[in-house]
Curated annotation (Swiss-Prot):
Top-rank lineage group of the source organism: Eukaryota
Function field: May be involved in the transport of sterols.
Pfam families per UniProt: Oxysterol_BP
Any one biological process term the GO annotation gives: lipid transport
Record InterPro entries: OSBP_sf, Oxysterol-bd
Record-stated family: Belongs to the OSBP family.
Protein name: Oxysterol-binding protein-related protein 1B
Gene this protein is translated from: ORP1B
Gene source species: Arabidopsis thaliana (Mouse-ear cress)
Gene Ontology molecular functions: lipid binding
Amino acid sequence: MEARVISCTTFGDNKVVKIAVLNHQAITKYKAGENETTVVVSDDTCPEKDVKEIKKFCEKLGYVYEGRLSEEYTQTNTGPDDDWITNGFESDDDVDPSIKTIGFNYPHVNRRNKLPDPVEKEKSVSLWSMIKDNIGKDLTKVCLPVYFNEPLSSLQKCFEDLEYSYLLDQASEWGKRGNNLMRILNVAAFAVSGYASTKGRICKPFNPMLGETYEADYPDKGLRFFSEKVSHHPMIVACHCDGTGWKFWGDSNLKSKFWGRSIQLDPIGLLTLQFDDGEIVQWSKVTTSIYNLILGKLYCDHYGTMLIEGNGEYSCKLKFKKQSMMDRNPHQVQGIVEDKNGKTVAKLFGKWDESMYYVMVNQGKESESHLLWKRNKPLENPTKYNLTRFGITLNELTPDLKEMLPPTDSRLRPDQRYLEKGEFEMGNREKLRLEQRQRQAREKQERGWKPTWFSKEKGSETYRYIGGYWEARDSGRWDDCPDIFGQVH
């Protein structure tokens, strides 16, 4: 039997090794005791005879084999991504080993790894033919057929920005250890990482109904997220997330303009991150544009200046460089971290769709560069929507989950569900029906309608979570939740 070590990273007393065995991918976690190292094989698809060979192979390397992981921790047949092992880090001797292994104790949760196969063949419809009469208008108010959507709502897209939430876990831990410079660097990497999933994504998310919600209970990431559409005109979505050592919240009013060959999206809103020790950090997103609406390949770009600041020791300024037509090195992000005296103490550089690095600056001299964040590997066979592995999980609806959700959750939206299954005609029919209902939303708002789970802060236009959602979920009481999607015909 062939067996070889693909990679081995040492984290203090812990070792994580990936072994390839025949046609099976076996991920093994080595945990070192005082006098021995134990080996756990987590691929339950591996035949028993191969497991015996793995045992011999491991013992030959000087390790003691201890068997497989329990079913609760067994990975999917495709095998987990390498990032499950390293938490996004490459080997770096300057990084505390215990920081790298944050999140290893989170439970594994089996989630789907592909969308359903489409039932119907999709129609070819020109985007230009649908929007050519709306030059200069706000496209959030333009109704498009379901063919131009992706099977996610704007509420779910808010959660997608938290794909690399481990960076905030690490930021929390750095702060606990008194290293607030590494904290702000990890926060900056997180602020950039949310854009990585947009590469190749040209379809529009569904505009939520007034009062529509979305929950994401992800113990495998150590967090719980909740969002709600709190206003129809202007269109505002608000979110709140409880993480491990931190809380994150914000609202977003997205202004869009169509300029003929491109669409410009300007986010209006403030994102707030609060650590358990009281430090608060805030920033706003940069401008996004989608190009080549008439001719050529559609692509998106993000550009502008992002300021990350709060009540801590450091602030960060990131510059997202605008892509030019002849740019051979697009998507660049550069930034600096300053102390309270305005002195530059670190620099950042990278690309929003690849990775971010940092260098320390001391008396004008720069250290070697170190990796902060690296994008997860894309799918080998992506769908037309170019969703990431994480993105594919966002609209998953299991029977058990369906029983617990309120009637306002995005997963229950019929046009979005039909689109995901590739039932385009039914999806379009339902989208038209719901848009008819949505036209009543402004009247509701004018009559004094208020969000169920969020309210404006006193003296501010910012929406904050008022609590109660997870308690209602635990009790199964959704009496205050309207049937916003109505009867499905």
